[in-house]
Amino acid sequence: MITFEFDGKQFEADEGVLTDYEFIADILEADDEPKALIRCFKAVFAGKDREYARAVGGKMATMGDLLKAAFEAAGDTAKN
């Protein structure tokens, strides 16, 4: 798990999921299957997706930004 900051709050994400090919494929295919995106949120945020959605205001677009921040945090960890 990695910890990262978004909108002044601390969040955790599963770094292993964020760097997994199957997960990346599911994200890219989410346009064809909307449920895939929700499964991805659940996987990345270790089941805390609804809690995190409430913490960031409940908007899907903001959850997308949170997911992007998680990817960036995983990338920063991989560089170190």
Language-model regions, residue ranges each:
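Short, surface-exposed, charged amphipathic helix/loop patches that serve as local interaction elements
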Residues: 7-10, 14-80
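Short acidic-hydrophobic surface loop/beta-edge motif
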Residues: 1-7
